[in-house]
């Protein structure tokens, strides 16, 4: 409620480019006709995917949940219809000449979106819910975009971005292309959002050959009970197996992401984070022969606090 009151309009993220065109057309038509700001807002509200908070009356229950949602003007749709880019080739194209800042930036790399949406169903994840269904981008288009974007920016790293990079069906082909295309040019390939149960050892081993880096996995919760609550879909056996595969592939640095304050969390769940990290560290010494170890294993554990997000099963969950 408090956020909506500060916005004249809100656009559906997935199709902002398409909605901008329709919105600008409505703005120009209203200006040409000498219409008022309210006339423009009324016209904008009729564009599928645009929400104009001032044209709706929302009532709330005592617990803060929505009791009713209704338009206040004739012609304004009762519901704002979600808009989607279905064909990623026809309706979407990556920015091939992104702005390069004059100062050192944290995200100093090319970001290439390889797919949109996620095949998983983690109950805390807003993006995984609102960007359904999963839509992959054509691998040949991605190859050309990568080539052009790196040439235009001069960056030395490219991030293959998605909600779950290892679920992209053409990942191996794309990574092989990037390694061959930029061989000898010291271009690092970053694969964020890896699922430990979909760890592609052959792909990651090739990436590791380009530039040594640590691996990041996100079990999210330390206990099996809590992972089941959030629908993470990971068992301890799968986690340890995936970590073992990474260690056998030559890694000795692993980052682990967890969340605190998840719904139904107990003290035992929090202690489970330390226990799981310890078991992963022990796995390194179990699967890697002493003569093949590259020093001690490094397990870095990072935690963040759960924040309930709209449009997720946990949207009304309290924060601890």
Regions found by a protein language model. Give the residues of each.
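Conserved structural-core and active-site-/substrate-pathway-adjacent residues in large, well-folded domains
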Residues: 1, 9, 50, 117-118, ...
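Glycine-rich beta-alpha loop elements in corrinoid/cobalamin-binding modules
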Residues: 1-70, 310-320
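Short glycine-enriched, charge-decorated loop/helix-capping segments at active-site entrances
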Residues: 129-131, 229-234, 315-320
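Conserved SAM/AdoMet-binding glycine-rich loop
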Residues: 147-305
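N-terminal pre-triad scaffold of radical SAM enzymes
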Residues: 96-123, 150, 191-192, 213, ...
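Iron-sulfur (Fe-S) cluster-binding segments and ferredoxin-like electron-carrier domains
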Residues: 125-141
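Gly-rich Lys/Arg/Thr-decorated short loops/hinges at beta-loop-alpha junctions or inter-strand turns
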Residues: 101, 122-130, 221-227
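N-terminal [4Fe-4S]-dependent radical SAM core
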Residues: 53, 59-111
């Amino acid at each position: 409620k408090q956020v909506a009151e500060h916005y004249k309009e809100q656009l559906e993220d997935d199709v902002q480019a398409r909605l901008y065109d329709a919105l600008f057309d409505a703005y120009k038509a209203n200006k040409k006709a000498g219409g008022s700001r309210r006339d423009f807002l009324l016209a904008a509200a009729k564009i599928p995917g645009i929400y104009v908070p001032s044209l709706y009356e929302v009532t709330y229950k005592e617990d803060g949940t929505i009791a009713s949602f209704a338009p206040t003007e004739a012609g304004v749709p009762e519901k704002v219809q979600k808009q989607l880019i279905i064909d990623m080739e026809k309706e979407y194209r990556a920015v091939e000449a992104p702005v390069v800042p004059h100062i050192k930036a944290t995200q100093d790399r090319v970001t290439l979106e390889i797919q949109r949406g996620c095949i998983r169903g983690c109950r805390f994840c807003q993006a995984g819910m609102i960007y359904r269904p999963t839509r992959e981008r054509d691998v040949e288009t991605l190859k050309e975009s990568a080539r052009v974007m790196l040439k235009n920016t001069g960056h030395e790293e490219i991030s293959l971005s998605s909600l779950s990079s290892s679920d992209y069906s053409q990942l191996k082909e794309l990574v092989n292309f990037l390694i061959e295309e930029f061989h000898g040019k010291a271009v690092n390939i970053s694969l964020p959002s890896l699922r430990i149960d979909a760890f592609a050892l052959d792909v990651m081993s090739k990436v590791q050959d380009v530039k040594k880096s640590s691996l990041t996995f996100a079990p999210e919760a330390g206990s099996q009970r809590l992972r089941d609550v959030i629908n993470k879909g990971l068992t301890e056996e799968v986690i340890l197996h995936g970590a073992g595969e990474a260690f056998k592939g030559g890694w000795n640095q692993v980052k682990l992401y967890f969340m605190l304050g998840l719904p139904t969390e107990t003290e035992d769940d929090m202690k489970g984070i330390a226990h799981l990290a310890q078991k992963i560290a022990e796995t390194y010494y179990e699967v890697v022969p002493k003569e093949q170890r590259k020093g001690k294993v490094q397990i870095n554990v990072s935690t963040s606090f759960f924040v309930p997000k709209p449009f997720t099963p946990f949207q009304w969950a309290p924060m601890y």
